[in-house]
Amino acid sequence: MVTGVFYHPSFSRRSYLTLGTRLKDFPSAFEEIRHPKLRILESPRVSDELILKVHTPRHVEEVKSDSLCSTAWHSAGGVVKAAEMVYGGELRNAFCYIGAGGHHAGRDYFWGYCCFNDVVLAVQNLYDEFGRMKVAVIDTDAHHGDGTRQLVDLLDFQVLHYCICSTDYVSKDGLKIDVSYFSQDYLDAVEEFCERAETFGPEIIFWYFGHDTHVGEYGDIGLTVKDYIDIAKILRELAEKVCEGKLIVVLGGGSIPEIAKESTLAVIRVLLG
């Protein structure tokens, strides 16, 4: 089984001012991780039919009119296809590059360099193709995944949604959790997610990975590439334990090209084992 890496040439061109140039070293950077079990795939365009199962028609029209969202269809499409191929057994796991983010996109709003909610679209597609299932989502971007939280509630998905952000919160059903990175060690928070996920029993795991938490980034909370490697190892082991290794890593926030290159390639190497 191979690791899939989803990418589209448009992601390396300028789109959102913060995200647009960070992938300037790609796709040539993939040459640094030549591996027999690595498969580079071009992210397809997501269908409007699927988008309209998650977002309103007005939302779609507003995204179409926003020139900064030009990469949104391929960004979301890569995540949708990755999840389908991993769950269907064509790939062991996957890493998805994006040109426009997803976790700040709700039912009828978008902000913060996000356009369509890629992970929620992927879950909706899994439900359509394979039936309802339990899904776990961990968000280690510097900012709260408010759009994802709203949508998993509205759409009544069976999702454990765990955000490591700046506040502490646990919903009544125990499935929507925010953990403040000020209140405990970061890796301890990741381990707590693993404990909850083992109890929950997901069939697939999504990791929304933002390198905006890195030292010197706009969401700097003191993390380094070594921390990202440790998190990747923890989540890979969790996936192997609870869902036959089915793990999708979705790139989130971050702006510095050197950090984008080093951190994403490091995480891909962990996925390759």
Map each language-model feature to its residues:
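N-terminal low-complexity, Ser/Thr- and acidic-residue-enriched intrinsically disordered segments
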Residues: M1-L52
